[in-house]
Amino acid sequence: MTDAAQRISELRNELDAHNYRYYVLDEPSVPDAEYDRLFRELQALEAEHPELVTPESPTQRVGGEALSAFGEVRHEVPMLSLGNAFEEDDLRAFDRSVQSGLGLAGGDLFGGGAEVEYSCEPKLDGLAVSLRYENGQLVRGATRGDGSTGEDISANVRTIRNVPLKLQGEGWPQVLEVRGEVFMPKAGFEELNARQAEAGGKTFANPRNAAAGSLRQLDPKITASRPLEFCCYGVGQVSGELPGTQVAMLQQLKAWGIPISRELKLAKGVEACLDYYRDIGQRRMSLAYDIDGVVFKVNNIEDQQQLGFRARTPHWAIAHKFPAQEELTELLDVEFQVGRTGAVTPVARLKPVKVAGVMVANATLHNMDEVARLGVMIGDTVIIRRAGDVIPQVMAVVPERRPADARPVHIPEQCPVCGSAVERTQLIKRSKGKASVSEGSVYRCVGRLSCQAQLKQAIIHFVSRRAMDIEGLGDKTIEQLVDEKLIGSPADLYKLTYEQIIGLEGFAEVSSNKLLAAIENSKRPSLARFIYALGIPDVGEETAKVLARSLASLERVRQALPEVLTYLPDIGLEVAHEIHSFFEDAHNQQVISALLGECGLELQDEGELSAEFSAVATLGGMLDKLNIPTVGPGAAQKLAERFGSLEGVLNGDWLDMRQALPERQAKAVREFFDETANAQRARAIEQQLREFGMHWESEKKVAEGLPLAGQTWVLTGTLEVMSRDVAKEKLESLGAKVAGSVSAKTHCVVAGPGAGSKLAKASELGVKVLDEAQFLEQLKSYGIEA
């Protein structure tokens, strides 16, 4: 090694050590002037010896060449969002849910229960990112995006001063993906805005907007000039072992040079969590950065894995949000807007006022029921809040300030956009047993797609990135297409011609051809994307994925009865009715038929019903779903055990019915099925369960030929080649049942690194144990690759 190379290596190591002490330990070891001197010396040496410059050198944070666009990054482990708690009772309910999920006493409302350990840290108000290290070197940075796919911001994250370009120490996993928040400290935000104002540039409303805008610059040199910082809160994909608790894992990351929260604490029990929340809340304004709450996570990693996930949120973590900031202002007027589903909703026009750093002139009033509840009138002084520090809403009226000329708010009789009638629909909650309960009302424009507001919103949703992903069809272009009457439904997009497009404002030959190509390229969507694009009320992206993954064909989704849909994860009866009603609508049927017929769309991943839902129904469960008055799950199961079939229940005599149930319930069952419509409905549900392969009598057929049928397996510890969710799916596809605890009936336990009590229990009971390599070999023997 030459003298220059030796000195460069020494300087890099010394500067990395100073950065670690400054940003991670908060213990500066040298004055800023000394750091700057060392940095300039390194710059000079690298300028003299450019062949010695490496990507991880501290001098390379200044940013490289500008990009034309961000690349796409698929997250191997999805970056999920957190559920929210807004009140102390919400957090206590979360704690009870955790205890129940872990099988601890106290999972009910009144039990004491064991105290669960939680990690506690502030919820930074910034942008979630992923940093991937391979062999200790930073190789990629990505935004959260939609949780499954983000943007490649590697060049930009390398410019953030406290992000280590290479890890400290030793023993890190070969692949280590850390997740955290990029944010802008308050002081840096004020300095940036002062510089922007002095230069005549755009100032930012708040530190979060400044951080997001700075991180997503195509020119990394701009990002390098912004005072951004990173704080790690967890990990994603890891090939190797990490400590078995959240706090110990974060402390290990800190030892490797990854910055973590200085406010990280361990709390035992929910009351200690609430103490932490109150303490941070009191110190919130004095912190060097903006926060909007506190995050609590079950500390034990194996417990986290046992608790699992909902569609988009973990069962083992929650964000306890702070109350939103509020201000007083005047309600100048109420206007009405029309949404994608025709809902006519009131919007408050306000005298502009600054709330949480943002100038607010409009706020949501939600619906006319909320207007009535508030008793709000035009001219009132109102309290507005930025809910979640994002969406402004009217919270209350100050009645003593009401002027004499205040005017009541009236819903228009005609749609403000198309002039069609506005009709009031009562929202009914179909409660279990029995009596339907009103949940307020909604006013809708009956114009449907003849209403330009509804049509525009429907098309905007249809072409959006997470739906059909037709690039080049922005909101303004869609407005032109609708205003010029070139499209009247989503199907008309596929009939557009070059001559029609080039006549639009902002389009020339190249852009017109690009748009036509984008429309053509969208003709082979996944089933989930297509379902989401249809804009079914209450069906978001995750519910669309559930429908596609579970039923695996559009025809099954279209035919599915509401009660059958409720067998799918996270689909309740209300959403099921929305789905069923949407596909029963004649106009919707016409649009779908046009898309799949003359427009030439081909859905790519249709197939057989997911094995997870084969024979998922039981007779007792189906009877319970019929909502027979006074008959709950227990009584429904007694009926199933007594009669053995639906026809047996329908035709059973009074004596048999009374032997199964008390007189009051037996009478309710008899009266329910005496109504022909109810009996027909029950038979229709059972018939569809048979057709879909979900009927309880399908179980024997499903089990035939499946090598693990009748076996119960348990997964524990960390699996490196595949996630535990994937392993569970593969086992279930072979006929196995995957349980959360070990018993004498357990056939086999798959144990990865970090396996704890379940592995010990398996050894105690003499249950067969496989490590991951052996498990993969067994899967391979059945023709299933990892």
Curated annotation (Swiss-Prot):
Alphabetically sorted, this entry's keywords are: DNA damage, DNA repair, DNA replication, Ligase, Magnesium, Manganese, Metal-binding, NAD, Zinc
GO molecular-function term, one example from the UniProt record = DNA binding
Which InterPro entries does the UniProt record give? BRCT_dom, BRCT_dom_sf, DisA/LigA_HHH, DNA_ligase, DNA_ligase_AS, DNA_ligase_CS, DNAligase_adenylation, DNAligase_N
Reaction(s) catalysed by this chain, per the record, are: NAD(+) + (deoxyribonucleotide)n-3'-hydroxyl + 5'-phospho-(deoxyribonucleotide)m = (deoxyribonucleotide)n+m + AMP + beta-nicotinamide D-nucleotide
Instruction: List positions binding Zn(2+).
Output: 415, 418, 445, 451
Which BP terms does GO give this entry? DNA repair; DNA replication
Where would I find the BRCT domain in this sequence? 703-786
Q: Which domain of life is it from?
A: Bacteria
| Matching Gene3D superfamilies | 5' to 3' exonuclease, C-terminal subdomain (1.10.150.20), 6.20.10.30, BRCT domain (3.40.50.10190), DNA ligase/mRNA capping enzyme (3.30.470.30), Helix hairpin bin (1.10.287.610), Nucleic acid-binding proteins (2.40.50.140)
Q: Which residues form the signal peptide?
A: none
Q: Where is the active site?
A: 123
Residue stretches spanning the membrane: none
Q: Which family does it belong to?
A: Belongs to the NAD-dependent DNA ligase family. LigA subfamily.
Check the record and name the NCBIfam families matching this protein: dnlj, PRK07956.1
**HAMAP family per the record?**
DNA_ligase_A
State what protein this is by name.
Answer: DNA ligase
Can you name the source organism? Ectopseudomonas mendocina (strain ymp)
Q: Which gene encodes it?
A: ligA
